Amino acid sequence: MRKKVSSSGDEGNNEYKKGLWTVEEDKILMDYVKAHGKGHWNRIAKKTGLKRCGKSCRLRWMNYLSPNVKRGNFTEQEEDLIIRLHKLLGNRWSLIAKRVPGRTDNQVKNYWNTHLSKKLGIKDQKTKQSNGDIVYQINLPNPTETSEETKISNIVDNNNILGDEIQEDHQGSNYLSSLWVHEDEFELSTLTNMMDFIDGHCF
């Protein structure tokens, strides 16, 4: 006889217990892993009578019961490593945790949200001001200028802008010639060809 399947598609969903784990449940899970090893988490409920689903058993072991999980506060070295990895990987906590020995993705995520994100919120502003890695620049008025000078400098005639754009192409050759001074005949001929190309004489 087939088991009744709930609307969510999980078999025997009502059989599993949710919420905090007890000391007795932890001991059952640890004894099972010691005897059978990790993996096949869905078999634990059948073989041990533990009323927990396979996913719950796996997460409990990986995040709390495994002897490889490091306890205690994060060190400065771990903080620095997490910050560097987060700049590269973003919020990919499982990938970050794999590169932080002894820490789980759950530990790293919680520590980031409760400590590092707030800490970096203060440091980011200081860092951006000190290292110069600013993408957008804000042009502030020169403090030595008077208010009238600032207003005059900010007024731009549309006709002048259009005139500058029209003259740009005609001044291209003069601009290049002002940057280059050659005495060698070959270099002079090469430069002449470049000037002709800019002026539209070469096809």
Curated annotation (Swiss-Prot):
Coiled coil: none annotated. One of its GO terms (cellular component) is nucleus. Its main location: nucleus. PROSITE patterns: HTH_MYB. InterPro entries: Homeodomain-like_sf, Myb_dom, Myb_TF_plants, SANT/Myb. Pfam families: Myb_DNA-binding (PF00249). Disulfide bonds: none annotated. Residues 41-65, 93-116 bind DNA. Gene3D superfamilies: Homeodomain-like (1.10.10.60). One of its GO terms (molecular function) is DNA binding. One of its GO terms (biological process) is positive regulation of DNA-templated transcription. Restricted to roots and hypocotyl. Specifically expressed in root non-hair developing cells (atrichoblasts) at the N position. Also present in lateral root cap cells. In hypocotyls, expressed within files of epidermal cells located outside a single cortical cell equivalent to roots N cells (at protein level). Keywords: Activator, Developmental protein, DNA-binding, Nucleus, Repeat, Transcription, Transcription regulation. It is found in: Nucleus. Residues 13-65, 66-120 form the HTH myb-type domain. SUPFAM superfamilies: Homeodomain-like. Interacts with GL3, BHLH2/EGL3/MYC146 and BHLH12/MYC1. This protein is called 'Werewolf' because plants lacking WER exhibit hairy roots. Transcription activator, when associated with BHLH2/EGL3/MYC146 or BHLH12/MYC1. Involved in epidermal cell fate specification in roots and hypocotyl. Together with GL3 or BHLH2, promotes the formation of non-hair developing cells (atrichoblasts) et the N position in root epidermis. Regulates stomata spatial distribution in hypocotyls. Binds to the WER-binding sites (WBS) promoter regions and activates the transcription of target genes such as GL2 and of CPC. PANTHER family: TRANSCRIPTION FACTOR MYB8-RELATED-RELATED (PTHR47999), TRANSCRIPTION FACTOR WER-LIKE (PTHR47999:SF59). This is Transcription factor WER. It comes from Arabidopsis thaliana.
